[in-house]
């Protein structure tokens, strides 16, 4: 089985309206729900517009898909600037492109960032199609692609507010049994020391460096600003 996923790049910004769907349309009609789900399944990104801006007001919408997964970050997880942060999300610093919780055995299937307020300078969002980058490597840098698929990386979360550390080994690019893309794991902030055979280390460093550079290349990336009431779904 090969999914109907549509790879995209920076040109998606020129058709940004095509990935937007109204909150009330999703909440009140199966047609709106299907439109949202197809965007997520086929494109991997969607912006829900004109949602309420009260805390937890997105839950009725999310429950149209499934239950919300609980984590130790609390539900919902608030992306705010706090003193003595235990996570880079709790700072005003720009975040590099990454995927969340790569040290989970099963990282989130979908995530939803609900913008309640965005009045500060900066605060723009970005999106990158990791599968498009993987496809580029598959077609143009096969040795690097194979390294990213075949050599597991070590991810670890060491949070000073938690009693335990969490870690997991997984490749940067995972494939299904049919050779289709399954998931991407990229997070410099939670990548641990390399845990591979010494003969592979130089090759792994080279592969991960190129992968990271391409994941931040403008030709694969879109940038936009979330407005209050937007829900960034991916």
Residues covered by each model-derived region:
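Extended acidic/polar, glycine-enriched regions
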Residues: 1-18
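Active-site environment of non-heme Fe oxygenases that use a 2-His-1-carboxylate facial triad
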Residues: 13-45, 50-233
